[in-house]
Amino acid sequence: MGNTKSAEKKGIGALNWTLLLVIGFSAQIAWVIENNWFANFLYSDFGAQLGVVTAMTICSATATTFSALFFGTLSDRIGSRKKLITWGSILWGIFTIAFGLTHYLRDSIYNDVMLVGVTIVAADTIMSFFGSMANDAGYNAWYADMMDDSNSGQIGAVAATLPVIGTLVGTLVGGMFVNGLATEANPQAGYIIFFSVAGGVTILVGIASFFLLKDAPTLKPVKDGGFWHQFG
């Protein structure tokens, strides 16, 4: 009986395939920026700040893990992945742009190394928090909801290739921005523009998701006691 249903199962549709690719690809570009380019930007703009980089790594990993668990639980309880993808992507994009704008802290609080470090770590941590909300808790669960025996191989294969493609494209395109748009007056201009463009695209993806993306029809709210009981 299960095989008959699987054989009769229709595909996920052109729109969902498009969203799967576009949302997933834009998310991987944003992660490449956070994982690869933020530290380079920090070194270029403020010099070798190993303590700040270490703090960024620890706080980002903590925020990502907590966000995935928190919003994953919330998503199950409200029965919606769309809201997480939409609002998470918009906020993710905003804080990706904001990280580049920390460059202008040099003129205002440059001598206060502690304040600069805290601001940079906070911007990166918040960006990672909303990135995990949109991608880990929202997007990953959204496409998992559409998977069954008839399409799990296709969807899984596409999702698995996106990090590889995103890393390659993000590294190459990022290098073009960073090296090609730097000026003598502002050597960090390429970083700022790259972060702004990528953040803007992520915001647009969130807006598009609001209008185009739909949760799986089988998705229903699941509540098991209180929120923190279900969270644990």
Where are these regions (language model features)?
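Juxtamembrane intracellular "pre-TM" segments in multi-pass secondary transporters
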Residues: 1-14, 216-232
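Helix-loop boundary and gating motifs at the non-cytosolic
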Residues: 2-64
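Central cavity-lining transmembrane alpha-helices of secondary-active solute carriers
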Residues: 53-75, 93-95
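Glycine-rich segments within core transmembrane alpha-helices of 12-TM secondary carriers
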Residues: 60-65, 153-179
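A membrane-interface helix-boundary motif in multi-pass transporters
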Residues: 81-82, 111-113, 176-200
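C-terminal ends and interior cores of transmembrane alpha-helices
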Residues: 87-114
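Cytoplasmic helix-loop-helix junction between adjacent transmembrane helices
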Residues: 124-161
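C-terminal membrane-cytosol helix-exit motif in multi-pass small-molecule transporters
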Residues: 199-219
